[in-house]
Amino acid sequence: MQVSRRFYIFQWVVLILIFLVVFAGSFVRMSGSGMGCPDWPKCFGQWVPPTELTELPANYREAYLLKRQKKVEKFCAFLQKIGLENTAKKIKNDPSVYIEEAFNARKTWTEYINRLAGFLAGNAMLLSFAWLLRYYRKRKWVILTALNLVLMGIEAWFGSIVVATNLVPWTITIHLFLALVIIGIQLYLLHNISTKERQGVPQNAAFKWLSWLILLITFYQMFLGTQVREAIDALVKQGFTRAEWIEQLGMPFFIHRSFSWLVLILLTYLFWKNRKDWHYSRINVAFYVLAAELFTGVALAYADMPGLVQTAHLVFATILLSVLLLMRFDAQA
């Protein structure tokens, strides 16, 4: 079944909006704005958040802490039901969970813009689902879009958990990986509805094996990156400065850095082979994105981890993973 050009372009718009959410979320984390709104889905009880402290009641910190405590209790009860008693206990007994930040207009509006990006992406996906039901109704496409819509709802709900638990690091990691799953499904949908024949896709076993290997290593790299980020969050709580982070980071950081060289070697070989024999454009894109990713990684390691570079590092990693997924989809087709 062939879709209209408008529908195909709209699916790319949905994907870009999801990427915007990843970018905004990374910027929120980098800027320390995650608790800029202490409640969810509203921000300080309003759909449009305040800009001045005078717009809030005198006891706003106590009031929102009480709301968060109730949500934490519900989440911990859920964790206990699914057998994660120790995790629930750790969250309940962690005093940092119950620290309520003072109002900061810059942080509040940074987090609010992040939520607006999520709202736009979610509604674009809902419109996409309605469009499919109205004009196409192909079973596979409807299932993919419906699944992504459900995952987007779960992602939004889990965002409220991240806020309720005062940014417990592992909850932020799950929040990110849910976004990556949503991106993966959207890419698969785009691959399925595309009628364009991809030129130069290598069909030999070496390419298929190497593309799988690079994809898996890159995914593992992103997991290691989240572990490094969680370690940094712990260092921040302990009072370490940016200049001290690198020397305090443990084995995950060194493995993360070492695996980068492995990805570079493998993708450089594919890039060389592609220029010589295949002329498949996505290998070139993956190679250039990896170069940008490695550049930001070096900047993080040797320039005391500047905040905006942290955001760029995650965004390039997400783009690289997406291009590698598209390569795999092309190879399977």
Residue spans of the language-model regions?
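N-terminal signal-anchor transmembrane alpha helix
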Residues: 9-34, 217-227
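Aromatic-anchored segments of alpha-helical transmembrane domains
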Residues: 23, 150-158, 218-224, 289-299
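Interfacial helix-loop-helix junctions of multi-pass membrane proteins
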Residues: 27-39, 103, 156-176, 229-242, ...
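Membrane-interface loop-to-helix entry segments
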Residues: 109-127, 171-182, 251-266, 310-319
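Membrane-interface helix-loop-helix junctions at transmembrane boundaries of multi-pass membrane enzymes
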Residues: 132-146, 271-286
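A juxtamembrane structural motif centered on a specific transmembrane helix
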Residues: 188-210, 326-333
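Membrane-interfacial catalytic/cofactor-binding modules of polytopic membrane enzymes
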Residues: 221-263, 268-272
